[in-house]
């Protein structure tokens, strides 16, 4: 497809926005889903200070800004800021006119219906797109892995969900959602670093902790054993240099932080861990298809990027499943972007072209058309 008429694929995550052109093998723009507003009064006249900053620019000026994420737990909570992010995506990052391209957006399953209606309305009424579609994130990840059957455990910054898919059909009754993801782990790491005497409190400092988490954390295969090793030696300790040059040391926090994915009680949550959620999701499916799901468990999203997570999932699900069951955890190296990649594949299929919601259909039916045309 040519760039001039190619569909735009925008995966609006709670933490990062991934955007690009259908048919490409990777997103062209990846930036934080952040809108920042100055905390202080501007005193330098004529500097052209803006009243808000989006994405990387907000991130780089974070020291003087209050940072807000308009998407929480996969649901848009601030539509004005969301519009700013889309505007930034089209005009600054991709440099396209949205009224000239069909737009494929993504959404977490089990989102409130009003969320996708409002997305549809903004695309057609604010950005005047000729056509649009809203796809379920996990389904796109399965496309990207080249499968039509499997269970996707997709964990991003705001929401984790398990979606069983059989021969291309998502099984809605068996989809489970867990509001525990990367942002909660960042907050938890902030908390346990405070116990070590390092204080991180502001929205800007939270971003530093997120970086520590992404660079140094890993999932232990055996948590108790790892705790014992950490207590008896300093072999697991790593140091991290803060932006001001101060160096901090982190030890068992490296694996205690992502352990919360398997033991949500660490965060004071009563829900099941990601391994049990995946298992429960499989158990909600017909007995005849479970075998295929166990053998095709696909990890997707940035929060599945911790070293050791696939081995741990394999171990935990093996312990829950029938003893003779073959279990295979698939963790593609590009899984951070597999939702976007799946969207790029889907939007460039010739068979998909009749699936778009056109401006004409929208004008006839209004925003509720999205429930009829998009799963």
Curated annotation (Swiss-Prot):
The keyword Nucleus applies. Keywords: Acetylation, ATP-binding, Cytoplasm, Cytoskeleton, Hydrolase, Methylation, Nucleotide-binding, Nucleus, Oxidation, Ubl conjugation. The modification Methionine (R)-sulfoxide is found at residues 44, 47. One of its GO terms (molecular function) is hydrolase activity. The keyword Ubl conjugation applies. The modification N6-methyllysine is found at residue 84. The modification N-acetylaspartate is found at residue 2. Pfam families: Actin. The modification N-acetylmethionine is found at residue 1. Actin is a highly conserved protein that polymerizes to produce filaments that form cross-linked networks in the cytoplasm of cells. Actin exists in both monomeric (G-actin) and polymeric (F-actin) forms, both forms playing key functions, such as cell motility and contraction. In addition to their role in the cytoplasmic cytoskeleton, G- and F-actin also localize in the nucleus, and regulate gene transcription and motility and repair of damaged DNA. Polymerization of globular actin (G-actin) leads to a structural filament (F-actin) in the form of a two-stranded helix. Each actin can bind to 4 others. Identified in a IGF2BP1-dependent mRNP granule complex containing untranslated mRNAs. Component of the BAF complex, which includes at least actin (ACTB), ARID1A, ARID1B/BAF250, SMARCA2, SMARCA4/BRG1, ACTL6A/BAF53, ACTL6B/BAF53B, SMARCE1/BAF57 SMARCC1/BAF155, SMARCC2/BAF170, SMARCB1/SNF5/INI1, and one or more of SMARCD1/BAF60A, SMARCD2/BAF60B, or SMARCD3/BAF60C. In muscle cells, the BAF complex also contains DPF3. This is Actin, cytoplasmic 1.
């Amino acid at each position: 497809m040519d760039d001039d008429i190619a569909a735009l694929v925008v995966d609006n995550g709670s933490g990062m926005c991934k955007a690009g052109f259908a048919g490409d093998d990777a997103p062209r723009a990846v930036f934080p889903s952040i809108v920042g507003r100055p905390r202080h009064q501007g005193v330098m006249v004529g500097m052209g200070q803006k009243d808000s900053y989006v994405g990387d620019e907000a991130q780089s000026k974070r020291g003087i800004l209050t940072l807000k994420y308009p998407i929480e737990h996969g649901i848009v909570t601030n539509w004005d800021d969301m519009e700013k992010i889309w505007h930034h995506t089209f005009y600054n990052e991709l440099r396209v006119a949205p009224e000239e391209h069909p737009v494929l957006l993504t959404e977490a399953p089990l989102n409130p219906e009003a969320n996708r209606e409002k997305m549809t309305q903004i695309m057609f009424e604010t950005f005047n797109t000729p056509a649009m579609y809203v796809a379920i994130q996990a389904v796109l990840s399965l496309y990207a892995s080249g499968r039509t059957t499997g269970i996707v455990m997709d964990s991003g910054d705001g929401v984790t969900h398990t979606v069983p898919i059989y021969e291309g059909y998502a099984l809605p009754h068996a989809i489970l959602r867990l509001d525990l993801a990367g942002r909660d782990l960042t907050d938890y790491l902030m908390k346990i670093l405070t116990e070590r005497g390092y204080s991180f409190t502001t929205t800007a400092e939270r971003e530093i902790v997120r970086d520590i988490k992404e660079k140094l954390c890993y999932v232990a295969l055996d948590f108790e054993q790892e705790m014992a090793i950490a207590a008896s030696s300093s072999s697991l300790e790593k140091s991290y240099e803060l932006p001001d040059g101060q160096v901090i040391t982190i030890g068992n926090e490296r694996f205690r932080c992502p352990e919360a994915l398997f033991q949500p009680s660490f965060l004071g949550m009563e829900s099941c861990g990601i391994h049990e959620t995946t298992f429960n999701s499989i158990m909600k499916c017909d007995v005849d298809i479970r075998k295929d799901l166990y053998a095709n468990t696909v990890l997707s999203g940035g929060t599945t990027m911790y070293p050791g997570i696939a081995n741990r999932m394999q171990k935990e699900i093996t312990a829950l499943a029938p003893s003779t069951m073959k279990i295979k955890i698939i963790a593609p190296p590009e899984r951070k972007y597999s939702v976007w990649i799946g969207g790029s594949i889907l939007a460039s299929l010739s068979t998909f072209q009749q699936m778009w919601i056109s401006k004409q259909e929208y004008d006839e039916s209004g925003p509720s058309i999205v429930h009829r045309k998009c799963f």
